[in-house]
């Protein structure tokens, strides 16, 4: 099993069970050590809020999912240097948010798993889709 960088949607699809969860299960079986920039948590909170507002999650479910996510990613969150993020955003044309994940993958020499096709098309050497 290797270490990989994952974005928030990969974490969300693993924990919020749905049609894409099976692919995330396979990914976790192959590469069980997941890391991410600290930004993942803010983005995950946003996913939970959105699901609550659409009625897809009850508040108590959100709390459980938050605990599960924090447990999954404990000691695996990195502070990203802002100038490095700017550099990657400039080089790739990706949003600063996405560039945090790309920068971390580049800096650690790891693959970034994401469901964002735009990121994959702009960074084919680093980013890939879980399948």
Labelled PLM ranges:
Residues 72-115:
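Active-site neighborhoods of divalent-metal-dependent phosphate/nucleic-acid chemistry enzymes
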Residues 45-73, 84:
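Active-site-proximal, substrate-binding regions of enzyme catalytic domains
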Residues 1-39, 51-60, 118:
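Short, well-structured N-terminal submotif of metal-dependent ribonuclease cores
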Residues 41-45, 82-83, 119-120:
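Alpha-helix N-cap/helix-start and coil->helix boundary motif
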Residues 1-3, 102-131:
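Acidic, PIN/NYN-like endoribonuclease modules and their adjacent C-terminal/linker elements
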Residues 12, 48, 86, 103-106, ...:
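A cross-family signal for key residues in well-ordered alpha-helices
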Residues 10, 16-20, 34, 64, ...:
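Contiguous, function-dense segments enriched for cysteine-driven chemistry
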């Amino acid at each position: 099993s290797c270490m990989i960088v994952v974005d928030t949607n990969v974490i969300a699809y693993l924990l919020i069970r749905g049609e894409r969860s099976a692919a995330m299960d396979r990914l976790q079986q192959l590469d069980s050590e997941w890391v991410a920039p600290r930004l993942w948590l803010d983005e995950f909170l946003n996913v939970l809020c959105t699901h609550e507002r659409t009625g897809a999650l009850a508040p108590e479910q959100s709390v459980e999912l938050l605990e599960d996510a924090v447990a999954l990613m404990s000691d695996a969150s990195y502070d990203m240097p802002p100038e490095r993020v700017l550099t990657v955003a400039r080089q790739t044309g990706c949003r600063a948010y996405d560039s945090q994940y790309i920068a971390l993958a580049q800096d650690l020499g790891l693959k970034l798993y994401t469901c964002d096709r735009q990121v994959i098309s702009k960074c084919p050497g680093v980013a890939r889709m879980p399948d």
